[in-house]
Amino acid sequence: MRKSLFSLFVSMALLVSFSTPSWAKVVDLDSLQAQLSQNEVVRGDFKQSRHLEMFNQPLTSTGIFTLSKSHGLLWQQQIPFAVNLVLTQDKLRQTFANQAPKTITAQENPMAFYFSHVFLSVFHGDTAALKEQFTLDFSAQDSGQWQLVLTPKQAPLNAVFKTITLSGNTHIDQLMLEELRGDKTEIEFTQQASLPKELTDAEKAQFDF
């Protein structure tokens, strides 16, 4: 469970950090960083494909997500089965179908939340913190498409991942996590929108612990 949670931490934090308004055109790393955290809320669909060395076919899941700068991440897997995950700065609640929810805190599992906090430093515009953890390789095309490859430089990240690659245009469209042991996770994000600008009452209720 810890590794799957880590993948979600990475996805959440990088999405929050690099979501940009629809009019923005990212041409270099500076312009990418300059547009951090422009939207209070980002919603969309996701498709996650987990490629494992032991299986010929990827394990695929789909659902919807809601990201809030002030509240955290609401990650709602719908297929192949329902999973509701709520992540805040210091708490995580996971609910499978009609089972009772399970909650962990940063105090109970500091290592898991360490990963989230590392990437959330980008959310605050702390590019120095990102460069402490990764070697950054950025490229952009005239069309506005861009790619950022993160190569971990130190433990514990470099003990798990070979590279983390983000690509997109005005938003992150794809996130790929390549592990040292050969496994790979690809997450595609579509239908991203930032309206309404605030969480609905139903969305806010999800973040009540």
Describe the residue ranges of each PLM region.
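An acidic-aromatic
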Residues: I64-F113, T185
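Gly/Pro-enriched, hydrophobic low-complexity segments
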Residues: T127-F209
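Polybasic/polar functional segments that serve as interface/processing modules
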Residues: A24-L52, P58-T66, R93, Q99-P101, ...
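Bacterial N-terminal signal peptides
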Residues: S7-S17
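Flexible, processing/modification-adjacent segments and terminal tails
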Residues: K25-D28, Q35-S37, R43-D45, R50, ...
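Positively charged n-region of N-terminal signal peptides that target proteins for export
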Residues: M1-S4
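Sec/Tat signal peptide C-region and signal peptidase I cleavage site
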Residues: F18-A24
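Short hydrophobic/aromatic-rich beta-strand segments that constitute the beta-sheet cores
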Residues: F46, L73-Q77, L92-T95, L148-L150, ...
